[in-house]
A protein has these predicted regions:
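Short, flexible helix-loop junctions that flank or precede catalytic/ligand sites
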Residues: 1-218
C-alpha cells in the first residue's frame, strides 16, 4: 500500500493493473521510480524500475557506437529534416539512444518536443509530454497537435500503428526532424513494416534519414 500511495495509485483497486511513478532524493540527487502493479490470485505483484539520470542518460559518445555507425548518426542528426528510427527488441536500449540523440539536438535555438508513454527522464530544455490513451490523448492526437507548436525536433516514443506512422512521415517531409522507435528484427525491416502500416512507398526515400538496429550486449 505504501508504494501505491507514493505512486498516486488507487490503493483500493486490486483487480486491474496500474502504472505510476514517484521521485525521491537519494545519494545527493533526484531519482525516479516507475511502478507497475499486476493482480494475481494471491495478491498484487509490483515491479519497480529505477530511473537514475546519472546512469540512464547517456551522450551519443557513450553509446558504444564506433566507426561508420557513429559517423552515420552524426551525419543524420545534422540534417534539417527527416526521420531517424531506432529498432530492436524490448530492453535493448532504444529509449536510451533516443534520449542521447535528443540531448545532442537540445539547445536554446531548437524547439524540441516529445510524446512519450511514459516520460522516462525529465531533461531540462525539452518540452516533454506523456500520452494518456484513457482520455483520448494518444500518439496520433498528440502528433496532430504537436506540429502546431512550431517544433524543430519531434520525438515519438514508439510508432505503434498506421496513423502514427503516416503522421510521423508527413512531419518529416514538412521540415521536422522526427525521432522514434519501431519493432522490427533489423534495420532493413523498417521499410516493409512502414509500408505494411499504410505509408506510401514513394514517401520513404525522401523521409527516412537513418534506420538503426541495436542489441544490448550483457
Amino acid at each position: 500500500s505504501r508504494v501505491k500511495i507514493l505512486s498516486s495509485l488507487k490503493i483500493d483497486e486490486t483487480r486491474v493493473p496500474q502504472d505510476g511513478r514517484f521521485r525521491t532524493f537519494a545519494f545527493g540527487r533526484d531519482i525516479d521510480f516507475r511502478v507497475s502493479t499486476f493482480p494475481t490470485p494471491v495478491g498484487e505483484k509490483v515491479a519497480i524500475r529505477v530511473l537514475d539520470p546519472t546512469v540512464g542518460l547517456k551522450g551519443v559518445e557513450n553509446l558504444g557506437l564506433v566507426g561508420h555507425a557513429a559517423q552515420m548518426i552524426e551525419e543524420a542528426i545534422k540534417k534539417p529534416f527527416g526521420m531517424i528510427l531506432v529498432t530492436g527488441p524490448t530492453g535493448s536500449g532504444k529509449t536510451t539512444t533516443l534520449y542521447a540523440l535528443l540531448q545532442e539536438l537540445n539547445n536554446v535555438e531548437t524547439n524540441v518536443l516529445s510524446l512519450e508513454d511514459p516520460v522516462e527522464y525529465f531533461v531540462e530544455g525539452l518540452n516533454q509530454s506523456q500520452v494518456r490513451p484513457e482520455i483520448g490523448y494518444d500518439f496520433v492526437s498528440g502528433l496532430r497537435q504537436i506540429v502546431r507548436q512550431d517544433p524543430d525536433v519531434i520525438m515519438v516514443g514508439e510508432i505503434r500503428d498506421g496513423e502514427t506512422a503516416k503522421l510521423a512521415v508527413q512531419a518529416a517531409l514538412t521540415g521536422h526532424i522526427v525521432l522514434s522507435t519501431l519493432h522490427t528484427n533489423n534495420s532493413i525491416g523498417v521499410v516493409p513494416r512502414l509500408i505494411d502500416m499504410g505509408v506510401e512507398p514513394f514517401l520513404l526515400p525522401s523521409s527516412l534519414n537513418l534506420m538503426l538496429s541495436q542489441r544490448l550486449v550483457r
